[in-house]
């Protein structure tokens, strides 16, 4: 996953307005892409515990953003979960 190629595509897909780069939806989508990429890395490198810690931190940050979104805008929260194929 090259972040210079993938990041603008994700931002374009989930942005809420033209100059949006930091809304909760965009942040969750970017974190999900990084989490998915790191999960694949950890499947082949099982003993990479430093990366595993980073994965857990990213998952926790994503969970906090999703909780915020759920509290403040429930329709966007459910739509985002469906788009990203996330549970809960």
UniProtKB/Swiss-Prot annotation:
One of its GO terms (molecular function) is structural constituent of ribosome. One of its GO terms (biological process) is translation. Pfam families: Ribosomal_S15. Keywords: Ribonucleoprotein, Ribosomal protein, RNA-binding, rRNA-binding. PROSITE patterns: RIBOSOMAL_S15 (PS00362). The keyword rRNA-binding applies. InterPro entries: Ribosomal_uS15 (IPR000589), Ribosomal_uS15_bac-type (IPR005290), uS15_NS1_RNA-bd_sf (IPR009068). Part of the 30S ribosomal subunit. Forms a bridge to the 50S subunit in the 70S ribosome, contacting the 23S rRNA. Belongs to the universal ribosomal protein uS15 family. This is Small ribosomal subunit protein uS15.
